[in-house]
Structures are given as C-alpha cells and as structure tokens.
C-alpha cells in the first residue's frame, strides 16, 4: 500500500478525474507510481432472458443486466488477460490505473460474488488470468442490492466444465521494454470431473523501469517573499511480484455447490529517485507487501447462498531522503508498517413467487482491524459495516421489466457512527426486437483508504512537500442515474449522472506562511460528473473492422473549505476511443487502438489534452489457436506524457512526466482444450495497494 511516489507525487494524485489511459499500464510495475491513497496518489431471478435480435448481436438482456458476449466481442482482438478483456466493453476506460465505466467508478465481480479484494491487487490478479475462461460479462449501471455491492458493476461470468473429466492448462511468457526490461511468466491448470473442479494459477512478474519528471515550483509567501525551484527527477525501480491462487469447487448436486479459494500476492519493490537542478535530493524506498485471502462459498438449488471471507494484509516499508533544499543538508529515515485483518460473512435468499414476481433479501457484516505505525506512532482502528436488504423483480408481460431494492447500512468507526438507506430502481422497456431502453437510479457510499485517515506525515520533493493524513476524512454519499438505449444490439447510447456529496480528493497546497507544500485528502462539498457515451461498430469490409466510442463529460467540483483557496470549478471534456482490426491472413491479425481526451480538471489541477496510439501484430500458426505469438508497440508517438498544472490563484506547481514507448512480445501455449477461467477477486481498494 505504501509505495510512495515522492518526486512524482503531484502526478499520481491528480489523475483521478480523467488522466489519460496509459496503454500498457506500465506504472503498475513501478513502485514510485503505485502510491497509496495517502501517499500520492447470483443467481439471476427466474425472469425469462430476452434475446436482442440483430446482425451478430453482442448483447442481450438478462434481468437487470446487459449481458455481453465477450468471446464474440474479443474476436480478432489481441487480448492476453482478463483485465484487458474488460477494457473492451463499451464505455470502459482506464483512468489513474483504475477501471471506469462511463467515467465513473465500477466494481468488478466474478460469478456474482462480492469480495473484499479490489483495486491494484485485483487488477494485478486480473492480468494474471487468461482471457478464454470468460463466458460473458454482465454490466449493471445501477446494481440492485442482491449483488451485495452498490453502484456500477461488471460481473464476469465463467465457463465451467461440470461433468467433464479433463486436465487443461496454459503457459504464457512476455517481455516488454520501456527504457528497461520487464518480464512476466504465468502457468494455469484446470482439472474437472463430475464432482470436482480444481483450478491453480501462478504468475511471476519481475524487471526494472525508468522515467523522469520535470518539476517547477514558484512559492509566494504572505510577507511578500517568493521562492522558485526547477528540478529534474530520474526515477529507477525494480520489482518482483508473485500471484498464487488455488480454487476448489465441489458439486454436491445440480446447482448445489461448495467452493473454497485461496489467493496470495507477494511483492518486493525498490525505487530510487534522484533530483538535480535548483536543489539536489536523493530518495530511496524499499517496500514489501504480503496479502493472503481465504473465501468459502455455499450455494443451493433453492436460491439460498452463504459465505465467509478473511483477508490479511501486511506492508512494511522504509524511506531514506537526503536533500539540500534549504542550503543545508537534511536527511530523513522513515519507517512505516500497515497490518490489516478483515473478516466478512454474508447470507442471501432468492424466491420465485410466480406470476413473474421475484423476491430477494439478505444480510452481510464486515469488520476490519487496522494496526498501522510510523516511527514510534502506532494507531489502532476498528471499522464495522453491517447491512440488511430486500428487493423485488417483476416482469410486466414481455416488454417491460422492473427491479427495485432497498438496503439499510450501519457504519461504525471511532469517529463516525451512521445509518444510511440505499434505494435502487431499474426499469427496462423493449419497444421492439433489437431495441432496449434502460433507466436506473441508485445510491452509493465511497470510503477512504485505511492509510489516508492516519495522522502520519511523509516528506516529498526533497523536504519541500509534506504528505499528511486526515483522521476526520469522512465517507462520501453518491447518487447515480443512467438512461441507456441499445439499437440492433450493437449501437449504444448512454446518458449518465453522478453526484458525489462529500467526495474526497487529494490536492497540493502551497502554504502562505511557510516554505512548504502540503498534500492532504479533504472532503469536497460535491463532485459532479454527467455526460453521454456513444458506441458504434464501423466495419468497412470483412478484413477491416472498427469500433468507435465517444464520451462527453461535464465536471463540477466545489470545495468551500480548501485552506484559504476555496474553489468551484467546472469543465467540459471529451474522450474518443478507436479500435481497428485488420485481418491480414488466416493466421495473422493487426490491431490498432487509440484514445484522445481533451483538457480535464481535478480540483485545482488542470490536466491537458493527451492521447496515445498502440499497434499489435498477432500470429496464430495452428488452426486450433493453441499457440499464439504477439508483438506490439504501445504509445507509438510517446504522446501519453503527462503535463499537470496547478496555477490556481497564485499557486504554481507544474509536473511533466516523460516515459518511452513500450515494445513487447508475448507467447501463449494452451493444451488440453484449455478454456480460461475467471476468478473472484479480493477487495483491497481501501488498502491503497
């Protein structure tokens, strides 16, 4: 969690609104860009499925969900893993190393299972999972309470080989070069018979990385004095990470199953950032992290299911800083540690009441014990969350469907004690074959990371910057609404609105009384994102197939208590995403994809226009697709470089991050008719890892 971006702090904390998509997600391998939140940032109810007719349909309606045929959607796409597969869904983008749906946060689930693991650890696991195990993907813009999560959901459904005795597997290896070399190897095995399904996965990522940043600070004090600093920071990193998973399913009878899963993620990262210019500084960070997750699930053919989950996370790190910023040699040696234990239990029941009515209800309880320390300061935090919900589904003939639910939640910490109601409503209308009109409203609650509410301080930019925690940071309350129209099961238009009361963000602030810059999460009055998403296939001919996604977004962010610089800023920005496939021959495919976004804001930060263009050449020499070789180049024109500016009301902080294009090659071999299986993911979003 505590992978501190010291000399690139402003970059990391400012990408949340809509930083451009790093096409190769290179920052995830870089301990300096994987900062924690503080340190820089089902059973479907028995309603009939309605198939949307049309030419090569990619989506159908199932209950409250839009179900996408991922194997067809991914056809002729050089996608290696589940994370990249999700990014092919309409409206899905990557912002600040996180998946977004219509520029809003989204929860990824597997087989309808809500878990306690997410964020960077989830994405790391997704990248370790082969693509072909996905059967389809459900998209819910306003998830009902029976999913036991709130807000938008992408539910990956798996392929299961129940009743078939088989041993299947896959081996994968890749090398990528972006100034330095990085490598990834993984192996997967799946054994099934009439009663058992045993799934094993191991992946190993290792290598080095390099990039540099140009930083410019101009600081004006209330007494009239002013200071300016211009520096360049060279960042070198090395990382080793292991992902291990073992899943066991036992089929007692049809639709009657007990399953056990163990997930482990181990990482060791070392980073060095050396700055030169108006002052010199040297930063070294050593970080290790250990995550162990156990999950037990039980499901029955009469709609009852229950489960329990335990997650243990530990992350010690040490930071050494030397700096000549204030004309004297200063040094810091900071040791930090985080220990988190999380337990979760849940129950849920679904009934078919007849006459196209359905009823569902359930409960879940999560408790967390967080013992973290920095130097000689130790904090103990307990957090409890309990909820009850009830929901109903109804089919009014064959054209109109409705699902509504209500969840009551109790949230308790040493500071906050709150009861909250979360209503959800989803209405779907089918005017004629091939057309879907879907409307939904829902409410949600977002929680800060565990580390961001600690009263700890960390130094950055050679001692000029201070990253401080906020023990009084409160969860935010979010209201979401959407209206989606699907034409011929391929053309999609979606209006969306998100109103986040008390939404929290991290911004830089240059003090008016002393020579220091402070980073701190604070609650805004509100954060508003609303807009329109359009997606259409543009197939020129049999050998040239395209898709185009356009998103237009209105932003408004207001914070009336941000130090002595209250702000109320608005902005319109657009995103264009193109994907083109060129079928060169029976065994050869060229894929190109590009994205561009216009200027965006995050609080006092301006995020200039940028974009990227990627290309990949895939060769499948065998007719059964058991062997695949892919060569690619991401960010061909090196246009994803970040230029992030804070010049609001006398503030002056400018960061420019420069990375090289990425060249890579990968090889995949499958045996035994291997069909890749997805895994439920452990929610680590609040650990900041």
Show where each model-derived region lies.
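N-terminal periplasmic accessory domains that precede
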Residues: 38, 49, 82-85, 122-124, ...
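Short acidic/polar hinge/loop motifs at secondary-structure boundaries
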Residues: 115-142
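Extracytoplasmic beta-strand/coil segments of soluble accessory domains associated
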Residues: 58, 83-118
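Outer-membrane beta-barrel signature, preferentially recognizing the C-terminal barrel domain
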Residues: 445-495, 499-501, 519-530, 536-539, ...
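Face-selective signature of the C-terminal outer-membrane beta-barrel domain
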Residues: 196, 241-268, 282-423, 428-434, ...
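Short, acidic, small-residue-rich periplasmic hinge/interaction motif at the N-terminus
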Residues: 21-74, 94-96, 103-105, 151
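Transmembrane beta-barrel wall of Gram-negative outer-membrane proteins
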Residues: 180-208, 224-271, 290-294, 300-301, ...
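C-terminal beta-signal and adjacent terminal beta-strands/loops
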Residues: 20-22, 621-689
């Amino acid at each position: 969690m505590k992978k501190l971006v010291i000399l690139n702090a402003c970059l990391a904390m400012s990408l949340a609104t809509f930083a451009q998509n790093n096409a190769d997600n290179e920052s995830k391998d870089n301990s300096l860009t994987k900062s924690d939140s503080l340190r820089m940032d089902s059973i479907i109810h028995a309603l009939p499925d309605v198939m949307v007719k049309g030419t090569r349909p990619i989506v159908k309606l199932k209950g409250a969900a839009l179900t996408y045929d991922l194997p067809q959607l991914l056809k002729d796409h050089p996608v290696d893993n589940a994370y990249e597969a999700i990014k092919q869904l309409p409206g899905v983008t990557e912002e600040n190393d996180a998946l977004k749906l219509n520029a809003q946060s989204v929860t990824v689930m597997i087989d309808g299972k809500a878990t306690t693991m997410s964020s960077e650890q989830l994405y790391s696991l997704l990248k370790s999972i082969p693509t072909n195990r996905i059967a389809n993907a459900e998209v819910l813009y306003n998830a009902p309470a029976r999913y036991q999560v709130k807000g938008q959901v992408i539910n990956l459904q798996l392929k299961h080989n129940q009743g078939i005795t088989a041993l299947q597997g896959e081996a994968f290896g890749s090398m990528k070069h972006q100034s330095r070399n990085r490598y990834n190897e993984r192996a997967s095995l799946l054994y099934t018979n009439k009663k058992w399904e045993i799934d094993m996965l191991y992946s190993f990522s290792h290598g080095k990385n390099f990039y540099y940043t140009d930083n410019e600070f101009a600081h004006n004090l209330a007494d009239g004095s002013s200071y300016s600093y211009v520096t360049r920071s060279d960042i070198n990193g090395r990382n080793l990470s292991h992902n291990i998973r073992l899943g066991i399913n036992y089929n007692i009878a049809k639709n009657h199953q007990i399953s056990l899963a163990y997930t482990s993620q181990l990482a060791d990262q070392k980073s060095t950032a050396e700055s030169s210019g108006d002052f010199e500084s040297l930063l070294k960070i050593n970080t290790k992290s250990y995550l162990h997750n156990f999950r037990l699930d039980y499901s029955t053919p009469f709609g009852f299911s229950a489960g329990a989950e335990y997650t243990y996370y530990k992350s010690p790190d040490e930071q050494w800083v030397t700096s000549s910023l204030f004309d004297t040699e200063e040094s810091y040696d900071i040791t930090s540690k985080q220990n988190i234990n999380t337990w979760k239990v849940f129950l849920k029941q679904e009934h078919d009441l007849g006459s196209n009515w359905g009823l569902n209800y359930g409960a879940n309880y999560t408790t967390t014990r967080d013992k973290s320390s920095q130097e000689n300061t130790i904090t103990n935090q307990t957090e409890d969350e309990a909820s009850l919900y009830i929901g109903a589904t109804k089919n009014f003939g064959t054209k109109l469907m409705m699902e509504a639910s209500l969840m009551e939640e109790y949230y308790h910490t040493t500071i906050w004690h709150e009861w909250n109601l979360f209503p959800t409503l989803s209405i779907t209308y089918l005017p004629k074959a091939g057309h879907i009109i879907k409307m939904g409203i829902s409410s949600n609650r977002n929680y800060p990371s565990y580390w961001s509410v600690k009263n700890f301080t960390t130094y950055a930019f050679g001692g000029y910057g201070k990253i401080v925690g906020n023990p009084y940071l409160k969860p935010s309350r979010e209201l979401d609404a959407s209206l989606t129209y699907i034409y011929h099961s391929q053309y999609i238009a979606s209006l969306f609105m998100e109103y986040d009361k008390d939404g929290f963000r991290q911004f830089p602030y240059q003090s008016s009384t002393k020579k220091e810059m402070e980073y701190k999460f604070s609650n805004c009055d509100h954060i508003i994102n609303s807009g329109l998403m359009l997606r259409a296939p543009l197939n020129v001919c049999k050998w040239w197939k395209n898709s185009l996604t356009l998103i237009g977004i209105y932003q408004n962010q207001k914070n009336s208590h941000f130090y002595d610089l209250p702000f109320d800023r608005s902005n319109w920005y657009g995103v264009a995403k193109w994907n083109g496939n060129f079928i060169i021959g029976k065994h050869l495919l060229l894929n190109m994809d590009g994205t561009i976004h216009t200027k965006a804001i995050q609080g006092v930060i301006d995020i200039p226009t940028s974009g990227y263009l990627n290309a990949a050449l895939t060769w499948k020499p065998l007719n059964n697709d058991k062997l695949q070789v892919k060569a690619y180049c991401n960010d061909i024109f090196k246009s994803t470089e970040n230029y992030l500016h804070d010049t609001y009301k006398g503030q002056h902080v400018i960061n420019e991050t420069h990375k090289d294009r990425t060249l890579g090659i990968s090889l995949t071999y499958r045996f035994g008719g291997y069909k890749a299986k997805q895994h439920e993911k452990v929610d680590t979003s609040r650990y900041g890892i």
